[in-house]
Amino acid sequence: MFRTLVTGADTFLVETPMTSRTLARIFALLVTLVPLSALPAAAQMDLSGYWNREGDADNGYSREVVDLLGLPVSADGRAKALSYDIASLSATERQCQMYPPTYLLTGPFGLKISSEQDPITQKLLAWKIDGWGDRDGTTIWMDGRPHPSKYAPHTHGGFTTGRWEGDSLVAVTTHFKMGDIKRHVSFSSDRATMTYRFTRYGDLLTVTGILEDPVYLAEPYVLTEIFKLNTGGTGFPLTACEPIEELPTLHENPGLVPHYLPGENKWTNEMTQNRGIPLEAALGGPATMYPEYRKVLKDTYKMPAACKVDCGTPPAAPAGGRGAPPPAPVPGDGRGAVRQAR
């Protein structure tokens, strides 16, 4: 800083040591007065990029039709699962329906995450997670906007807002339609809420989801998946879904919805018959989520005498198909040896 010095007709700017020291003190004071609330912005992580799925957790697939083991279903959630018939997906209006937000953690694909800034202020407006062929895209709004009314229309992707907690992005999704928790086995209602935590550790991204549903769940259901950054990633191919005639009976009877009436699901005892899992365990519930549930089963579980499914041996070759043994020579044909050699 300078001081003006006037001598006769001349004017000089003279630097004063006292002023420089004062300026240094003012600067130091300003640094100490910076609000602590502004500091977490430096800790916010960059989540953008292509992320490949790395985890080997339960991906939501089930070999048995009725497999609610480990799911905290309520009585209504169990009734919904037992009434469901997967043939309903062959109805024209259901063939192209998408999975709910939980599919981000249970689906087979990776993530493509990008950010959206205000074009003038460059302030972060939202994080965007691209959709797949059977999952809607997710926009995580970071500008503080409120969630819509509970009466607002619901979509497959829902409405999501986010905030930073330290270096973790916490996102809450509401207003999504009823959909699968475990693919084609159990379901979440349109009153469910999904809370995500995105935490980055170098080139690894841990995503934890907590699903809460007052209708079909008796307790929150927790899912976790790990993704790894792929610096050479490319976009996910999105293909159009076109309904076709899969089951003629459904197209001949447009109002028909395949289902099971109470007590009529013929697959209810499948896990018990194939794997020896007691029926009360196969029907799920909060207790089946926890390791100590093994103590409940130890007196009732009996290992099947012989393996019935997933026995570790390759399936038999189809008769006459690829991999089938060559046909035996035809006696007196004269060409049998040649045909067998081929």
Identify the residue ranges that each predicted region occupies.
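Bacterial N-terminal signal peptides that target proteins for export
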Residues: 2-6, 12-29
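N-terminal start and proteolytic maturation junction detector
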Residues: 3-5, 38, 44
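N-terminal non-cleavable signal-anchor helices
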Residues: 7, 15, 32-35, 331, ...
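Bacterial N-terminal signal peptides
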Residues: 26-38
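PEST-like low-complexity, intrinsically disordered acidic/proline/serine-rich tracts
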Residues: 42-342
